[in-house]
Amino acid sequence: LDTSILSTDVARLTKLGATVVIPATQVGDVTWFAVLADPQGNAFSLFSRSTSERFEERVEVGEDYIVQAAAKPARGSMAWFEVGTTDHKATQSFYTRAFGWRFEFDDTAGGKQYYNIFTGKEWPSGGMYDLGADGADYLIPSFLVGDVPEVNELAESLGAVVEFGPDTNPDGLVYSRILDPNGNRFTVFSTPGM
């Protein structure tokens, strides 16, 4: 397995302010990965491509899922990601320089300081929420659901805490942020007409 690309990316990202949480680590004959944290402390992972047959099988399944999710995400699937930040300028600068992401203010968010994140396609695949100095920094997955209040009740019955929501944007999108019993944050959302 060639780790030179992964090592180059880790070195480049640390020069931009990221810190290494888990150094480059081999996963059998499948791949190498590293876990870094952005300047706000949010963890993210990098993976290297491999010529391993098992890696190619996993990539094929993953890419099929991404194509399906991009066309029409299924309920319960990860359909978005969100970066919550106490310093939107620093966060935007890091991810723009690190990965070439583009940020555009979301006029449909009802006056919230929310930016759509474009990771290379014409449609956004995530968002950045400027929470101000009193907020909390996070980088979390967002799952598409049919009924946000119902999912909130279920999550609470299983020991989770609904940190925020449900709230509704002017365009009808309903969302909540949840902290599971193990301390993992995620959001759930539904869209109009589901």
Predicted feature residues:
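Structural motif
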Residues: 78, 123-126, 138-140, 173
